[in-house]
Amino acid sequence: MDWIWRILFLVGAATGAHSQMQLVQSGPEVKKPGTSVKVSCKASGFTFTSSAVQWVRQARGQRLEWIGWIVVGSGNTNYAQKFQERVTITRDMSTSTAYMELSSLRSEDTAVYYCAA
């Protein structure tokens, strides 16, 4: 498995005191270096259009690393400089889903990726 490695995406969930806020992410992905991956984060239980969705990742034994965010209502994005050339964060308001696409994958991109709102 020299050229195949796993990028793992977990289910993220958040619970509010008086509401059921939930973010459900797409499942595990196995990709080859040089390809791209697009993962999703579906929101429910809160007003998606009034939120911002953040994406972070954590490689084994490393600290959380911020990738970027999108303001859902306006579509404005902000990316960490490290990922500027390789990441695109989008959203689909009709399905309350945010997406993070990472291109030109490298072995160093092997990590657990999380969304948060």
UniProtKB/Swiss-Prot annotation:
Q: Where is this region: Complementarity-determining-1?
A: 45-52
Region called Complementarity-determining-2, residue ranges:
70-77
Q: Enumerate the subcellular locations listed in this protein's record, separating them with semicolons.
A: Secreted; Cell membrane
Source species of the chain: Homo sapiens
**Protein name according to UniProt:** Immunoglobulin heavy variable 1-58
A biological-process GO annotation: immunoglobulin mediated immune response
Ig-like domain segment(s)? 20-117
Region Framework-3, residue ranges:
78-115
